Amino acid sequence: MNGDWLIRGRDGRLSVYQLSGDAVLCRSERGRGGAWTAPRTVGGEQKLHPVLGIGQGIDGYAHLVSWRPMTNGESGLVHSAHFRPHLGALDWNPVGHPRGQGRRTGAPAVAVDAQGRAHVFVPGEDGTVSLLAQKEKGGWEPWRELKGSSVQDCLAAATGESGRVELYATVPDGILHWRQQEPGAQPVLQEALQTQVRPGTLYALATSADSTTVFYTDVSGDLCAWRPGDEPAVVVASAGPGPVSAVRCDIDGHDCTLLAQRSASGRVAFAAYPTELESAGAWWTESGPQLSLDATVSLTTDDNGRVVAATSSPSTGQLLLTARKDEPGLALEAWRQV
């Protein structure tokens, strides 16, 4: 999945999205901090390819995008919006194909601007990136192709604190960055970073009023952070081969960025450091049981600002949760299955 699959809704309840065969499932808290609902299918009976892009606006609404199989080996993109975790999401709505018609290409990435408009980014087979953006009063703008080439199937979209949408993508020799210059505008290709990135390791996070930070693992195995305009910094050696998740949170009165990753041992590893101060260093602490190889981790904060972490495995369907204890430091509650 591309994007945060553990989210806090507008009403403060937590919910998760999981891939399951040819469907997307959702589970949510029945009440804040309480029991969870059973899994339910998102968007009706539409069959999907096992890919999902997720974005959330400041209004708390979740936007989901996937590919659906069609006739003659072709596929099309579909979109659903989820307004309240305890209610059903809208049915999947076809939104087309970047080339009008054709086969499935890369996994979509989704970001939602300050006006609540979803922006869907899709990598193409020819190394381009296409954008589909919602209109403010309903409907969709035409597909647009962003500048840039040789893009690989690894996108990370984010919305800055300004409310403007940004996108990062890997290319064979680095990372490309696009940013909206004003709300509603097409993102513009900015500077590129020359580096070697492990596939599937990009994660973007808003870290200040003016900046987003993209995290990635380089080919030497270091987890790095880059803010356009600055030099990249090594945060810590990566704990494992997969993607990282990140969230900004308050730890003992300090604005910190918390990282989580499935470690090489199969457990979840956590590391924290002062936000945008990578030079302070970070170190991993492992937590919880050993997980299946396809398990991923996602982070968010609850209504009280408390960190919550979840792990999900498509092969087993297992969903585990933990939360930070109400005490100094980063001590976590025991992991529990829901």
Over which residues does each language-model region extend?
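A structural motif
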Residues: M1-V338
